[in-house]
Structures are given as structure tokens and as C-alpha cells.
Amino acid sequence: MKIQFDDPVFEAWTQRFLFTMPERGCEIGEIKTTAARIPEGNRDAWYQEWTATADRLSAEAEACWARSARVSARDLYMRASTYYRTSYPLLYGSPTDPRVKAGYAREAEAFARAAALFDPPIAPVAIPFEGMTLPGWFYSGGPGTRPLIIGTNGYDETVQIMHYGHAVAAQRRGYHVLIFDGPGQGRVLIQDGVPMRADWETVVRPVVDFALTLPGVDPARIALAGWSFGGYLAPRAASGEKRLAALIADPGQWDMIEAMRAMFLRFGVPSEVAKALPDVDESALEPIFAAIRRDPQLNWSFVQRGLWVHGVDTLTDYLRVCIAFRLSDRVGAISCPTLITAAENDPVAAFAGHLYDALTCPKTLIRFTAAEGAGDHCEVSARSVYFQRAYDWLDNVFGMR
């Protein structure tokens, strides 16, 4: 389904947040009319037009709030936040474009205004971490002691979008939910300039410490759920944080360098060269690097986003950083019940079976298919199918039925 653009990056980000529609995070008509105002390939216009739509909704939300129309104000702020979020990903890169910082600030502000209007309100939290704080939100599942789901992000998203990707569906089932952004994510990357790190157990440990100070959290029933690159980060965290009682990796991932080697093989790199990555002569890789830069989607994924997220300057440096992001030497330390997902058309899920096979803990593998509409990355075309199966699994693990 094409909405507007021939450029795959523009079109992907136009469609990106359609999955928020069931929770009133966007409207298809607003998306179509905004996209129609943007000339093909014009990134400045992209930022301007999505910002203009978000500004209009934000102003309308303020007017609704002034006349005590709380529900209308909340819904308008939520959609404004989504469109501010949409405004800046095409500008990713190092040094961080001031428009990325401004877009993120507006996104977070609109979400915060909406969060205060939920019943119960969604509570902002600041999690202490290595002399700074990690931004997050706490959702109460109701009175009494209840299990907690901690949601961890991946490469692309901000904590605000995890409202739709994790939190609301879990809260509806009676779970407390804590979502946060860590190094290399959201505000911590965009405004604080802190890049991604491999040792996610070091990040999650103080998050669990903080979670145990929240009202009504059952310390024996804490789950960690990661989506997108969180499908690496969450298992890595579970290998070193034993207070986690359940783990969800959506999708399951493996050593990052192995995924890169597989990609280079598809580009026609000889197998002996691919196996030696990253310790090969850079001149042998330059034709592949040039092909990556020519491809709009790959250039955005690896040059604009990847180098920026990891705080490196070259694709060779990126490959070297990948070595640290591995599970093969830690998977045996994961002891809690674990759910691994894999969507049929998701290349990020290519190594989900490797992770599942290597696990020695109680484990479940759920595959999502294109035929049921859930075959895309993180099942975003049918996220409710993910919620049904993943949270049914967790209900059984935690005795929520």
C-alpha cells in the first residue's frame, strides 16, 4: 500500500505510525494530506509540513483544554506528538541537526500534556543512571500489588512511541508498565548526546532498582520486553540481571556482526572476507560501502542513523562496534522464561531461531505470518496480534488468569 512517495525512506516514514491509530495516535487523512504537501525527496519540506500539521493540532488542543474539553485535548496532543515524531527522522546524522532536537522536544512536550489527561494520569519518571537520568513513563495497572512490564526500545523509536508499542495494551490487562529510553535512544541520544552501548544489563539494573520503588510493583513478577533492536538489548540485559522473571524479545536477535556478515554475503563479498569482518582491508569493502551510500534505505539505516546512534564516524568503525553487540557468549546465562518472536518478512528476525535454539531456559518461539497481516517488522501492521499472543504467554507465566 503506497500512500505518497517513490522514495522508500520517505514512504516508510509516512506509513511508520499507522499502527498507533487504534489508540488515537494518528489519523490516515491527516497523514495523507500532510504527505501530499511534500515534494518528492525534499527533506526540508518534510520537516516543515509535519511540524505544521503538529503545530495546528497542538494549538487546537490548547483551545480544547482552555474550555475544559479534556478528552479532545488529550487526543489532539497525542496526534500532535506523533506528527512531531514523524518530522525529524529523515534529518538524522552527526552532528545532530538542531531541527531533530527541536522536533524531539515538541514531541515530548505534546506527549507530556496528553499524559496528564489520562485517567489515571501517565506518570513521568526520571531514572538515575551514571550521573544523569533516563526519561520514562509509569502506567499503573490498578490498585494492589501487580506484575510489571519494563519496555525497552531499539534503534529508531522514542519512549513516547512505546505508549503504543507496549504500554497501553499491557495496562489494559492489569499490568503496571515502565517504559524508558536508554543510551543511544530518544532524548538520551538526541539531547544528551550519549550513544548506544552493548552492555544493556548495566542500563537495566538501575531501571529495576527504580522500578522496585514504584507503588504496587510485585518484585517477583518483573518482565522485560524489547522490540526492534530491543530484541538484542533485552536478552543481553536478562543475561546479567537476575531479578527479571520473564523476557520477551520481539524479534529475537543474535550477534550483530553475524547479521552484518550475512548482509555482506548478499552483496557478493567472498565468504572468506565476510567471515573475517571487521578485520579485513578496507579497500576490499569500499565497493560495498559505496553501494550502501547509493541505496536510499541502506544509507539512511547505516550512514545517517547507524553511525550517529553508535557515535562513530565511518562504516569501518561501525563494523568494529558491532563486535561488542553479541549474545553468543552470554545466552547461557539467561534463566527466566523467555519468549522469542519472529515475523515472516522481517529481515531483523533472521537470527531469531539462533537465539531460540541456544537458550537453555524455559522458552517459547512464536512466528507471525504475512498471511495473517503480522509479517512485518515488530508486527506493526497488526500489532494487536502481537499483543494477544505475547501477553497471553506472559499472563500464563505470571498467573494473571
Describe each region flagged by the PLM:
Residues 334, 340-342:
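Short beta-strand/loop motif that positions the catalytic acidic residue
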Residues 359-376:
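Catalytic histidine neighborhood in serine/cysteine hydrolases
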Residues 345-352:
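Conserved alpha/beta-hydrolase "acid-adjacent" motif
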Residues 194-216:
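Alpha/beta-hydrolase active-site loop
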Residues 239-319, 342:
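Hydrolase active-site cap/lid region
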Residues 155-168, 351:
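The serine-hydrolase catalytic nucleophile loop
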Residues 50, 54-57, 100-143:
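N-terminal cap/lid segment of alpha/beta-hydrolase-fold proteins
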Residues 369, 376-401:
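Catalytic active-site module of serine/aspartate enzymes centered on a nucleophile-bearing elbow/loop
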